């Protein structure tokens, strides 16, 4: 299994921007020293939910501040970008880092953020599909090309340079939770990124959709990659880990407020809401605990086919020192036990035989932060 921090720099107070960015760099540097494999950078705009409006610039800063760790986006919200510029900038970043980057993409799910760019959420899926097609063409076409879509038109024949450092392009991840996302990932050889908030039955169902889609397309189902984002805190005792729950609850409630456009002067109205996930289910789907309990939970994820874990540790104003202790303890006591694990061969067999699980979560904020569909 591979592990990396997920960064989106939440800032409930809407203050101290520079120090928040500096703290994030220190967290990433510590994770590299401890043997974490990568870092993922979110994209969010216009609120204290997350200050990551320029993921490729932030990725470049991280690259300058580290030596080895891989750097990925999770995700570039494709409908909010001019896709040729996105492809160009990602290619340049790929060269500057000598191939340390990978590109996570998503269609987005927040009407408030998209509205700020003059985009309706109902347009996000076709804009995403067209944008991804254009990005792929920009990276791979060696001769002049054009494109005619509903939203994106490239009428002047062009060839885009530079081509990426990695061939044919940086590895792609797709942030998403729907069966359609799994089918798209299968068709385009993209690594899916889903959320533990689906519950393990839901995640297993998604992996099944992905494996069956690849099988139906005549593609290999051996050695597949599947990524899982988990809200995580590692502490010496379960009691100490659970003391961080208010920070997670703020993040989830802020996410819900964004979904409902309850934002004033950039501050989300992060309040309790009807239909919040029951505490026992919430604790099952988040990863708060001592090292031993976290090892057990992550082994369960590996057993159903998960190969990559996105550790969402920075949420809701959690103290930097507490977060650094969590990163350190996880790196020293959890990572060494799990890093050599691979999913059992039976995970693919079970995935092929599995059926879709419906209704495993609702769109109430308890979801992946950069949904691809």
Please report, for each region that a protein language model flagged, where it lies by residue.
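N-terminal beta1-alpha1-beta2 module of alpha/beta enzyme domains
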Residues: 1-65, 69-71, 167-170, 348-353, ...
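Flexible, glycine-rich active-site loops centered on histidine and acidic residues
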Residues: 2-17, 79-147, 191-192, 198-202, ...
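Hydrophobic faces of well-ordered beta-strands that scaffold small-molecule active sites
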Residues: 3-7, 39-41, 71-74, 101-105, ...
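Acidic (Asp/Glu)-rich catalytic clusters
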Residues: 32, 59-67, 90-101, 184-187, ...
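Glycine-rich, proline-tolerant flexible connector loops at the mouths of alpha/beta enzymes
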Residues: 38-62, 77, 197-200, 312-324
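Alpha-helix-loop-beta-strand connector modules within alpha/beta enzyme cores
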Residues: 52-73, 127, 131, 327-343
């Amino acid at each position: 299994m591979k592990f990396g921090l997920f960064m989106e720099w939440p800032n409930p107070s809407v203050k101290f921007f520079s120090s928040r960015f500096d703290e994030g760099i220190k967290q990433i540097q510590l994770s590299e020293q401890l043997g974490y494999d990568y870092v993922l950078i979110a994209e969010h705009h216009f609120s204290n939910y997350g200050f990551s409006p320029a993921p490729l610039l932030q990725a470049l800063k991280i690259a300058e501040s580290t030596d080895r760790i891989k750097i990925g986006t999770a995700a570039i919200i494709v409908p909010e970008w001019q896709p040729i510029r996105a492809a160009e900038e990602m290619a340049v970043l790929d060269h500057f880092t000598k191939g340390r980057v990978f590109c996570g993409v998503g269609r987005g799910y927040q009407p408030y953020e998209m509205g700020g760019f003059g985009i309706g959420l109902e347009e996000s899926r076709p804009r995403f599909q067209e944008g991804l097609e254009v990005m792929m063409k920009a990276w791979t076409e060696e001769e002049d090309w054009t494109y005619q879509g509903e939203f994106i038109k490239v009428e002047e024949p062009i060839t885009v340079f530079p081509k990426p450092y990695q061939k044919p392009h940086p590895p792609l991840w797709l942030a998403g939770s729907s069966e359609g996302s799994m089918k798209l990932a299968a068709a385009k050889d993209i690594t899916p990124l889903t959320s533990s908030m689906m519950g393990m039955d839901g995640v297993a169902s998604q992996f099944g959709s992905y494996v069956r889609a690849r099988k139906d397309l005549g593609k290999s189902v051996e050695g597949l990659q599947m990524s899982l984002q988990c809200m995580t805190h590692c502490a010496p005792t379960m009691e100490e880990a659970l003391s961080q729950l208010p920070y997670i609850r703020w993040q989830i409630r802020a996410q819900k407020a964004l979904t409902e456009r309850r934002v004033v002067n950039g501050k989300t109205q992060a309040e309790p809401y009807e239909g919040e996930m029951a505490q026992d289910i919430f604790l099952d789907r988040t990863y708060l605990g001592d090292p031993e309990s976290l090892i057990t939970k992550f082994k369960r994820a590996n057993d159903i086919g998960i190969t990559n874990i996105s550790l969402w540790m920075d949420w809701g104003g959690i103290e930097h020192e507490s977060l650094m202790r969590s990163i350190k303890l996880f790196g020293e006591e959890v990572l060494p036990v799990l890093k050599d694990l691979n999913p059992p061969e039976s995970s693919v067999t079970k995935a092929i035989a599995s059926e879709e699980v419906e209704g495993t979560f609702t769109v109430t904020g308890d979801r992946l932060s950069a949904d691809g569909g």
